[in-house]
């Protein structure tokens, strides 16, 4: 596409140069941000733009998975029953953990809370280091992070359904165990909402524009795209539909994509590389890349149930 240019970094990451500010991250990641453009055209960034076109603000982090590690972050509530986690914020997580370079909100949850450390209920599977915090929701999808091999995006109910279908077959205990393995034995898994990119083809609802968070994987599983889109702010960013997010992921190189929790929960924090030469100051200091769209305090992250965090290997 002609809306942006690509170039390779010595680190093995890829930088996309939009008509807007950009900052290189450390450890195999690239941070790009821009605003403006025609939503219906996909990746169209412009510092000017025609005023009658919807405006978008978005940030993408392109990850070379040979150089970075993906880490699910969720904190079980002490003494709580299964299905509860303590709320946390991406920016505060980066501030407290200097080895990490990026963190995005992940699993949907209830209820909304206004401060960190409050019990919330993830909606869908969350598994961290083999400990399951919550159960799968069959209609939603999940990002699996296996100990070996590339990450995968699958339906949360697929493994359970396969296991149930084989339950009446004598001698198929091994098959049932294998079918159950992704959900039951996954070392790390973060549930999201829907698959919005399948085989490089966008899918999902076209109607509602909102703030969005999403992840996409390349066909060979070697690259991940993390995307955050600001929304619900006319004149600054109207957000994207689910299908539009799928198209953006495809344009950025993804083959399969997962929609994460969005709306007021959408938040992506990054840490600049100390040797970054873009912008003024702030090297190594975590910062938010999009302005969260929720009350009571606009611009402050909503505490969420889980994060997908990134650190160099």
What do these predicted regions represent?
Residues 44-57, 185-221:
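Conserved beta-alpha junction segments in alpha/beta enzyme cores
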Residues 113-137, 198-219, 223-256, 265-313:
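Conserved, well-ordered active-site substructure
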Residues 262:
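Histidine-centered catalytic micro-motifs
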Residues 81-86, 162-172, 235-241:
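A short, polar/proline- and glycine-enriched secondary-structure boundary/capping micro-motif
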Residues 101-105, 142-144, 216, 224-227, ...:
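Structural recognition of the beta-strand scaffold that forms the well-ordered cores
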Residues 1-136, 141-142, 146, 150-152:
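Zymogen propeptides
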Residues 75-82, 157-163, 228-233:
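Short, solvent-exposed aromatic-acidic interface loops
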Residues 105-208:
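Active-site-adjacent helix-turn-beta-strand microarchitecture at beta-sheet edges
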